[in-house]
Design a protein with these regions (language model features):
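Catalytic cores and adjacent flexible loops of soluble metabolic enzymes
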Residues: 1-108
Length: 108
């Protein structure tokens, strides 16, 4: 039976919790591009959205788990989402870029 996790990043621990989940065999995660979302109706008006899809993909790829996702293209989608909503999203990779992009620049 597949186990899934639904993680928010309110305290900055979503990636760490996803890492622990992956090591325990979790195979499905709820995530959002750029970390969209939140939970203001639950009494936390500054609650963060779900774990960022792009950060989850990066974690998987760095752990040797093939996702089949083009991370650079996904980061661009996150940047587009930020433009559409009209404010900065909490996702780190949409601002920093992927490790592969960094490695390509460093090797050039």
């Amino acid at each position: 039976m597949p186990v899934s996790l639904h993680l928010h990043d309110t305290r900055g621990l979503a990636v760490a919790n996803a890492h622990a989940g992956l090591k325990m065999g979790v195979s499905q995660f709820d995530s959002t591009v750029g970390g969209l979302g939140g939970c203001p109706f639950a009494g936390q008006p500054k609650a963060a959205g779900n774990i960022c899809t792009e950060e989850l993909v990066l974690l998987c790829e760095e752990m040797g788990i093939d996702t089949g996702v083009d991370l650079d293209a996904l980061i661009e989608v996150g940047r587009m989402a930020e433009e559409i909503v009209g404010h900065q999203l909490p996702g780190e990779l949409i601002h920093a870029g992927s490790l592969d992009a960094f490695r390509r620049r460093a090797a050039a």
